[in-house]
């Protein structure tokens, strides 16, 4: 192998699983290939591989809403503090938000942001759903 491919291989060894997943998705989009077919093709008779006409397109959701479902009264102060740290809301607005649940806290955010927001709010004591 050339030194350039050796360097690429060494860099690939150091990336996380999430980064590897994102890299595969970018390669698929850039070159118009499907890694799942390439992986299964090595162990399969090519005549039985699905054609493009047989595939159904399933779009992966990219934007999510984080919704506070319920806040126990004993946890209200912690949830208000967390809402304020996650948003630009003031004290009164954050208090009003948690008193009128279910309410959207974060709208049209990435899956990673939605999961992190959910984790923080659940740690504060709120019941959360992601849609």
From Swiss-Prot:
Forms part of the ribosomal stalk which helps the ribosome interact with GTP-bound translation factors. Is thus essential for accurate translation. Keywords: Chloroplast, Plastid, Ribonucleoprotein, Ribosomal protein. This is Large ribosomal subunit protein bL12c. SUPFAM superfamilies: ClpS-like, Ribosomal protein L7/12, oligomerisation (N-terminal) domain. The gene is rpl12. One of its GO terms (molecular function) is mRNA binding. It comes from the Eukaryota. Its main location: plastid. Homodimer. Part of the ribosomal stalk of the 50S ribosomal subunit. Forms a multimeric L10(L12)X complex, where L10 forms an elongated spine to which 2 to 4 L12 dimers bind in a sequential fashion. Binds GTP-bound translation factors. Belongs to the bacterial ribosomal protein bL12 family. It is found in: Plastid, Chloroplast. One of its GO terms (biological process) is translation. GO terms for cellular component: chloroplast; cytosolic large ribosomal subunit.
